[in-house]
């Protein structure tokens, strides 16, 4: 078992990581090979379009590293499905978009590996709650 020097969490555009900040300074302070990481990350996420991909990079004492990519943030998936640039500044007053229950279920299925929900329905409720807090209304929810 290698000794862990640090754990870095970043959110980077898929296939477009560069050695510029935030990647360079975050990995540089642990002495990890920045170019090696950006090449590996870009190769692994090239098929994800323009999504923002959260990544957890574990850097070891011998300066080697491993990384795990996660699913895109829920707010990103909701904005994309509703065709929005950003959520509502006042979600309780101004509604900025609509999603139907099928879209909510689709987002829930995408996020399932990263959620601690026991079922797709439970995950869908989590998605619906996030959407509501962004000022997006949900149509056709089974128990809303």
Curated annotation (Swiss-Prot):
Keywords, alphabetical: Methylation, Ribonucleoprotein, Ribosomal protein, RNA-binding, rRNA-binding
GO annotation terms (biological process): translation
Does the entry feature the keyword Transferase, yes or no?
A: no
Q: Please provide one cellular component term from the Gene Ontology annotations of this protein.
A: cytosolic large ribosomal subunit
Please verify whether the record's keywords include Cell cycle.
Answer: no
Describe the processing and modification events after translation: One or more lysine residues are methylated.
Q: Do you know which InterPro entries this protein is assigned to?
A: Ribosomal_uL11, Ribosomal_uL11_bac-typ, Ribosomal_uL11_C, Ribosomal_uL11_C_sf, Ribosomal_uL11_CS, Ribosomal_uL11_N, Ribosomal_uL11_N_sf
Q: Which HAMAP family match?
A: Ribosomal_uL11
* Biological role: Forms part of the ribosomal stalk which helps the ribosome interact with GTP-bound translation factors.
Q: What is this protein called?
A: Large ribosomal subunit protein uL11
Query: What are the leading ranks of the lineage?
Result: Bacteria, Thermotogati, Deinococcota, Deinococci, Deinococcales
């Amino acid at each position: 078992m290698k000794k862990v020097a640090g754990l870095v969490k970043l959110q980077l555009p898929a296939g477009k990581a560069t050695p510029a900040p935030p990647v360079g300074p975050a990995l540089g302070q642990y002495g990890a090979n920045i170019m090696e990481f950006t090449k590996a990350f870009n190769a692994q996420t090239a098929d994800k379009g323009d999504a923002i991909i959260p990544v957890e990079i574990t850097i070891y004492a011998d300066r080697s590293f491993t990384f795990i990519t996660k699913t895109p943030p829920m707010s990103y998936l909701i904005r994309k499905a509703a065709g929005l640039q950003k959520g509502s500044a006042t979600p309780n007053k101004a509604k900025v978009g609509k999603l139907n229950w099928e879209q909510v279920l689709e987002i829930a299925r995408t996020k399932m590996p990263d959620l601690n929900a026991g079922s797709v329905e439970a995950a869908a409720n989590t998605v619906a709650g996030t959407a509501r807090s962004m000022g997006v209304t949900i149509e056709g929810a089974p128990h809303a």
